[in-house]
């Protein structure tokens, strides 16, 4: 497998169909697709014959005897060196402080120079596009696993990814004007503007009859059924 235009557009459309459309937002698909194509061109400006882990995040790094071991790399492929940095340092729920993120990024560039020449200014300019791309891919995954498969962990992760996106959009991406306007509207939707810390326990009480089937449990954790006998 290889990081190429097909895989890029697949991920961007994953975001469009599994997350963006699920919000009910209206947008012009042809203009959005134009910016998707522009993004694929930007991401493919520099390629390297390196291993791209793809799902590189802290939960996939296990420590055994003081040494890191890596799991869940079946999505790995040949690709550019920027993607995994974006995946790890901008993972939605980690909320790394800016100082720590910059320190880790500096360490990465220093280590990378042992293998290939690195123009640090160009590296940073290219990395920001991969961070945006990875954030959209993650939202697509959260949309599919959360909104469609009803898995609560992914639904709970959405506000963190939206906040990442909100922070990214503070710096302009002139290459993708329409995409950015759509994303700014997305981050301003009411369901994404609530304080992450204010989410409270929700209890739903309803009646059902077995002849109509087993009631749906949207929480994904089994719920609780209370039986009462008629008086």
Locations of regions flagged by a protein language model:
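Active-site activation/catalytic loop segments of kinase-like enzymes and analogous catalytic loops
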Residues: 13-22, 81-117, 129-149, 161-170
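Conserved small/polar residues in nucleotide/adenosyl-binding loops
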Residues: 227-231
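All-alpha amphipathic helical-bundle segments outside canonical DNA-binding/catalytic cores
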Residues: 2-3, 119-131
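ATP/Mg2+ or Mg2+-diphosphate-binding catalytic cores
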Residues: 140-217
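ATP-dependent phospho-/nucleotidyl transfer catalytic cores
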Residues: 1-53, 64
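Active-site acidic catalytic loop and adjacent metal/ATP-binding pocket
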Residues: 39-85, 92-96
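N-terminal low-complexity segments that are often proline-rich with Ser/Thr-Pro
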Residues: 214-226
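Extended, well-ordered alpha-helical scaffold segments
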Residues: 28-39, 104, 154-164
């Amino acid at each position: 497998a290889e990081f190429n235009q097909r895989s890029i557009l697949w991920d961007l459309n994953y975001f469009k169909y599994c997350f963006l459309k699920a919000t009910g937002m209206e947008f012009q698909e042809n203009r959005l697709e134009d910016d998707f194509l522009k993004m694929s061109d930007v991401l493919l400006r520099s390629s390297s014959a390196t291993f791209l882990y793809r799902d590189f995040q802290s939960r996939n790094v296990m420590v055994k005897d003081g040494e890191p071991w890596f799991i869940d790399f079946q999505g790995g492929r040949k690709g550019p060196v920027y993607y995994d940095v974006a995946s790890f340092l901008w993972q939605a729920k980690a909320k790394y402080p800016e100082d720590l993120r910059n320190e880790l990024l500096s360490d990465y560039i220093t280590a990378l120079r042992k293998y290939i020449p690195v123009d640090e200014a160009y590296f940073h300019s290219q990395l920001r596009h991969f961070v945006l791309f990875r954030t959209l891919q993650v939202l697509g995954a959260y949309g599919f696993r959360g909104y469609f498969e009803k898995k609560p962990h992914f639904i709970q992760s959405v506000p963190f990814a939206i906040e990442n996106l909100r922070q990214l959009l503070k710096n302009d991406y002139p290459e993708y004007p329409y995409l950015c306007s759509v994303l700014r509207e997305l981050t301003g939707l009411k369901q994404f503007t609530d304080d992450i810390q204010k989410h409270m326990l929700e209890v739903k009480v309803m009646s059902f009859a077995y002849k109509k089937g087993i009631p749906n449990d949207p929480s994904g954790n089994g719920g609780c059924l209370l039986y009462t006998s008629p008086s």
